[in-house]
Amino acid sequence: MSSSPSRKNPRVLFVTSEVFPLCKTGGLGDVSAALPAALRELKADVRLLVPGYPSVLSGLKYKRKLAEFDLLPHFPPTTLFSSRLQINESVSLPLYVIHCPELYQRPGGIYLDDDGQDWPDNAQRFGLLSKMGALLASDASPLSWIPDIIHCNDWQSGLTPAYLHYHSGKKAASLMTLHNLAFQGCFPPDEVARLGLPPESFSVHGVEYYGNLSFLKAGIYYATRITTVSPTYAREIQHEPLGFGLQGLLAERSNAITGIINGIDNTVWNPATDPHIVKKYSSRNLAAKKINKLALQREMGLEENETIPLFAGISRLSYQKGYDILLQVAPMLADLPAQLVLLGKGDQSLEKQLVMLAQTNPARIAVRIDYDEALSHRINASADCFLMPSRFEPCGLNQMYSQRYGTPPIVHTTGGLIDTVTDLAPDTPAGESASGFHFHEMTADAFMNGIGRAIDAYYNTRLWKTLQHNGMRKDFSWRSSALAYLSIYSLLMQR
């Protein structure tokens, strides 16, 4: 919907299936709170639209009824509430909540039931989220506030641009952000009619994807513009294997795709103020890291030794995260000598093998099968080097956390890992802008070569401090990400 020429600040409806702290299963929940908050601090008028799960309704201090939709075609009776979500002391976000008891009021998870199975009516549940987003972003909205841009996130709101395409009146521009292309929201073709989409939409030039309806493909096909969560990932998804079958369409739309790195919360991830670590420090007193290192070695049952290089990993334990390769490397790493601390949970086979590995070498390897937020902070503050051998990584966060704490990462060259970690190349022995180490082939030998380069650098005190300082100086703030999104919003408002 075209904006007033006198109004420069965009009105944005941010549509998401999860937002921290009300409802979260992964990184999308964090992004959905942090990015809109950073945008509001830059004077964008951003409002959120979320489903009314039990945790959302119970987590709000108040809610005000805005509109009722008893006769919304193809969906159960629905009420739209407004509220506010307090993000920090200075920022709260206006929130629209879709209250539809038949679709959202139930025990279990956001996407899965108590048995870990997809809810059988997920097409309806997230079809309603998409439909309500499209309604509020058009001249059919019952509200006086109409957005210039509707910002959709992953498959759960992917039908929004499709609904807008088939709306004949005025409508907002749409932005589709792809956080993880592996999840595509595919459903049987009879859902097309049930969701109120016209029959002609079910074609290769529409929502059809290998004989099914794909919410994600719909968003990619119909959105005005597309963003991903890193520039490299934006290129990778236009080719196999990371296009997951959508690479042809994404390549066709390459001129509409922009990669923008996610940010991190610099107030939460700050070694100078972190309440979870033993000794606070900054780039001016990096020697304090050794105090944290000795404390972590003691906590994890490792030999206390401030000079031995301590490597660490914090991750979901999975094939995608490369932990099968790490399993091959860990015994070699312990023999160097070096130490290894791992924190995470996931694939049960990987969990068992890692625990057995730690039991065979308890002075050098420690494994905690869990996710512990406070411990993750202590690991970042204590380790000398962080390991991140992901096969693919749209953006990644831990490599940014580790650099913030003066802990150079070793990363596989994929996605956001390339964009956020500057390699110590062989021809730059002084360090220059380097902040970590890349390895290119997804093999134990290549990974071990990266670890070897890191150990050589670790024993060069001046070079190591350069790497630490370079990483700690990088700007991974959400403000930086928000400025990039504002540039995209500006393009959309000029269309």
Curated annotation (Swiss-Prot):
ADP-alpha-D-glucose binds at residue 24. Gene3D superfamilies: Glycogen Phosphorylase B (3.40.50.2000). The keyword Transferase applies. It is an enzyme of class 2 (transferase). The keyword ATP-binding does not apply. Pathway: Glycan biosynthesis; glycogen biosynthesis. Its EC number is 2.4.1.21. Signal peptide: none annotated. InterPro entries: Glyco_trans_1, GS/SS, Starch_synth_cat_dom. It catalyses: [(1->4)-alpha-D-glucosyl](n) + ADP-alpha-D-glucose = [(1->4)-alpha-D-glucosyl](n+1) + ADP + H(+). One of its GO terms (biological process) is glycogen biosynthetic process. Keywords: Glycogen biosynthesis, Glycosyltransferase, Transferase. GO terms for molecular function: alpha-1,4-glucan glucosyltransferase (ADP-glucose donor) activity; alpha-1,4-glucan glucosyltransferase (UDP-glucose donor) activity. Belongs to the glycosyltransferase 1 family. Bacterial/plant glycogen synthase subfamily. Synthesizes alpha-1,4-glucan chains using ADP-glucose. PANTHER family: ALPHA AMYLASE DOMAIN-CONTAINING PROTEIN, GRANULE-BOUND STARCH SYNTHASE 1, CHLOROPLASTIC/AMYLOPLASTIC. This is Glycogen synthase. It comes from Nitrosomonas europaea (strain ATCC 19718 / CIP 103999 / KCTC 2705 / NBRC 14298).
